[in-house]
A protein has these predicted regions:
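Feature captures hydrophobic
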Residues: 1-137
């Protein structure tokens, strides 16, 4: 289900791969999203100058060290902000909740430019699906 492109994945790559693997294994609704998602999602953590590319391929995830080309979405933020994305609650119709404390914090960082998501507007459905898979809530 989750594999690593490098024989020596970074700690960040292992952490994200492990988080997603655990979420998908323990929650049927996340598995359904995972099994249908085909996208390449880059995550660049600005304060540690490190990133990964999550290559989702309909039930399989390959985690790459660094940003690989041809990404559908690229998320750029500090480590704390990236981790807060995993705490977003998922509400009605599978949409992320932005009206609680965590959601307001994420929305504020997006508006302030402290969270940047390249490709967001043209791939909002993909972003929502990735958020559902990534969220531990």
């Amino acid at each position: 289900m989750v594999e690593y492109a490098s024989k020596e994945p970074s700690a960040f790559a292992e952490m994200l791969g492990g988080l997603i693997g655990a979420n998908v294994t323990s929650r049927p609704e996340k598995k359904q999203d995972f099994d249908t998602l085909v996208a390449r999602v880059g995550i660049w953590v600005t304060d540690i100058d490190e990133g990964v590319t999550l290559a989702f391929d309909a039930g399989k995830l390959t985690v790459h060290n660094g940003l690989e080309p041809n990404r559908t979405l690229t998320i750029r933020a500090e480590a704390e902000t990236v981790m807060s994305l995993s705490n977003l609650r998922i509400g009605l119709f599978g949409m992320p909740v932005y009206y609680d404390e965590v959601g307001r914090g994420v929305a504020a960082k997006l508006l302030q430019g402290r969270l940047k998501i390249d490709g967001m507007l043209s791939n909002i459905a993909t972003l929502n699906r990735v958020t559902r898979i990534f969220s531990v809530q």
